[in-house]
């Protein structure tokens, strides 16, 4: 995709998910200078309905040559600049499914539109000044949100809660640059620069950047979720734990060791964070080739998980098998889950032995659905203590934004070093301009075409 391509021509795409025989409504979106003309060719509105902006018309979509009715539909007309793209936009609200929307899209393409590239509607909104780059990225995050908190954070970005502080930081850098350049151009007419004040201002900007950088881990958690692996010996209650936690019968539960032969996955939300829970096969030495594959997959799941729930049988206590598994997973953030406590005398639970460097212990009786709240609390404690990091701010930055903020901070540190070394003022401006450019990349005030391509390729065709 190129910027020239993105702002020329009229584009069309299906804007809703295509679910065969399930979706009740399907939307075809058209944007560009020919959008209204295409709609007037295809759409027949009976009676005295008026084609006005931001009004919904009822009627029929007809083939322009055969006049055959393709669908009974609603038409929404939005004239520039009061539309998502700030261009003329029409939306055909058709019956759901596959056939109707595909036929309508084909008629739009035959009428002069071209098929939109992924994210091209939002790219046009950005290029036409309706959105900045952080807001555009927030739209993608909102569409892909997997939890209420992820959606709320994306909405905060869409409302400009990230763009505003970034613009203010950039403006502060520009003010400092103006002071320095004024001394370069009019040195004899102005008082000397206050070096200490400039350093103080730069330190304040860098401190605010550090606060924003602290939200990166939270952003990653909300976007990708927390991957949690339940591991342990066979028959310690791992599958029962998954079923109790997910409130379903995702995993088969029997009294026979080795029942789980593969990794069973369930998607949950804990404290607003999407959690991918993996119930793994019991880890032990075995001659069964199928079970051996399952054991190897269990080890792989544990080694790639953000958090490991090492599950043991409280009735049998800590065994050599538990110790062997612990040695394999102790390098990961870990919670020890003592399961089946309903089978143990309460007085004996506190005397159960385990490695003393395990600090997070949860007692559960998964078969009785007991201890799940305590388990979720322990997980959130690990997240909040930084073992799996997440900040408490309303907003959260992504990897691209974090890279730009990091570069801005490095540039500001280099400015400070330049001032301390008493180098000429021209040298001060070089790194200061670097910080300004890095901050501008976040909101899109200074951004390359390749970056735009990378960002908007994340979107679906109709967004």
From Swiss-Prot:
Q: Where does Mg(2+) bind?
A: 239, 260
Q: Where is the signal peptide?
A: none
Q: Give binding positions for K(+).
A: 235, 254, 256, 259
Q: Which UniProt keywords apply?
A: Cytoplasm, GTP-binding, Hydrolase, Magnesium, Metal-binding, Nucleotide-binding, Potassium, tRNA processing
The keyword Nucleus is annotated on this UniProt entry:
no
Q: Name one GO cellular component term.
A: cytosol
Gene3D superfamilies with a match to the protein in the record: P-loop containing nucleotide triphosphate hydrolases, Probable tRNA modification gtpase trme, domain 1, tRNA modification GTPase MnmE domain 2
Alphabetical list of SUPFAM superfamilies matching this protein = P-loop containing nucleoside triphosphate hydrolases, TrmE connector domain
Q: What single Pfam family name could you report for this chain, choosing any that match?
A: TrmE_N
What are the GO BP annotations of this UniProt entry? Answer: tRNA methylation; tRNA wobble uridine modification
Q: Where does (6S)-5-formyl-5,6,7,8-tetrahydrofolate bind?
A: 29, 91, 130, 463
Which residues take part in binding GTP?
Answer: 235-240, 254-260, 279-282
The UniProt note on the cofactor reads as follows:
Binds 1 potassium ion per subunit.
Compartments reported by the entry: Cytoplasm
Domain of life assignment = Bacteria
Stated EC number for the protein is 3.6.-.-
Instruction: Identify its protein family.
Output: Belongs to the TRAFAC class TrmE-Era-EngA-EngB-Septin-like GTPase superfamily. TrmE GTPase family.
Quaternary structure annotation from Swiss-Prot or TrEMBL: Homodimer. Heterotetramer of two MnmE and two MnmG subunits.
Describe the task this protein carries out. Exhibits a very high intrinsic GTPase hydrolysis rate. Involved in the addition of a carboxymethylaminomethyl (cmnm) group at the wobble position (U34) of certain tRNAs, forming tRNA-cmnm(5)s(2)U34.
* Stated name of the protein: tRNA modification GTPase MnmE
State the organism named in the record. Trichormus variabilis (strain ATCC 29413 / PCC 7937) (Anabaena variabilis)
Lineage, opening ranks: Bacteria, Bacillati, Cyanobacteriota, Cyanophyceae, Nostocales
């Amino acid at each position: 995709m190129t910027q020239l391509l993105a702002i020329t021509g009229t584009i069309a795409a299906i804007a809703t998910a295509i679910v065969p025989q399930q979706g009740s409504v399907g939307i075809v979106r058209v944007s560009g200078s020919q959008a209204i003309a295409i709609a007037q060719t295809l759409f027949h509105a009976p009676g005295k309905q008026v084609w006005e902006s931001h009004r919904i018309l009822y009627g029929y979509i007809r083939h322009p040559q055969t006049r055959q009715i393709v669908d009974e539909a609603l038409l929404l007309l939005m004239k520039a600049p009061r539309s998502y793209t700030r261009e003329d936009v029409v939306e055909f609200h058709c019956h759901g499914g596959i056939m109707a929307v595909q036929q309508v899209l084909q008629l739009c393409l035959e009428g002069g539109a071209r098929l939109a590239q992924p994210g091209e509607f939002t790219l046009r909104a950005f290029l036409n000044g309706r959105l900045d780059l952080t807001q555009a990225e927030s739209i993608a995050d909102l569409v892909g949100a997997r939890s209420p908190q992820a959606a709320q954070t994306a909405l905060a970005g869409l409302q400009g809660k990230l763009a505003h502080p970034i613009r203010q930081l950039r403006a502060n850098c520009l003010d400092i640059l103006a002071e320095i350049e004024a001394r370069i151009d009019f040195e004899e007419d102005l008082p000397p620069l206050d070096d200490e004040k400039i350093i103080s201002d730069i330190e304040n900007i860098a401190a605010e950047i550090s606060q924003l950088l602290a939200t990166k881990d939270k952003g990653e958690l909300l976007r990708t979720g927390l991957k949690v692996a339940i591991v342990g010996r066979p028959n310690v209650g791992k599958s029962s734990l998954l079923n109790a936690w997910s409130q379903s019968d995702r995993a088969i539960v029997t009294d026979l060791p080795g029942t789980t032969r593969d990794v069973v996955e369930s998607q949950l939300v804990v404290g607003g964070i999407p959690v991918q829970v993996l119930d793994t096969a019991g880890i032990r030495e075995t001659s069964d080739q199928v079970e051996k594959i399952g054991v190897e997959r269990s080890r792989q799941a544990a080694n790639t998980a953000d958090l490991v729930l090492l599950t043991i049988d409280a009735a049998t206590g800590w065994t050599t098998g538990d110790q062997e598994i612990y040695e394999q997973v102790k390098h990961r953030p870990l919670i020890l889950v003592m399961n089946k406590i309903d089978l143990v005398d309460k007085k004996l639970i506190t005397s159960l032995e385990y490695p003393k460097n395990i600090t997070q212990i949860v007692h559960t009786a998964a078969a009785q659905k007991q201890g799940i709240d305590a388990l979720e609390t322990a997980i959130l404690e690990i997240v909040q203590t930084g073992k799996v990091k997440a900040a408490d701010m309303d907003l959260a930055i992504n990897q691209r934004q974090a890279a730009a903020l990091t570069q801005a901070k490095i540039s500001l540190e280099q400015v400070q070093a330049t001032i301390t070394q008493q180098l000429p003022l021209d040298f001060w401006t070089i790194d200061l301009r670097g910080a300004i450019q890095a901050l501008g990349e976040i909101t899109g005030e200074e951004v390359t075409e390749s970056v735009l391509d990378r960002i908007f390729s994340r979107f679906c065709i109709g967004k």
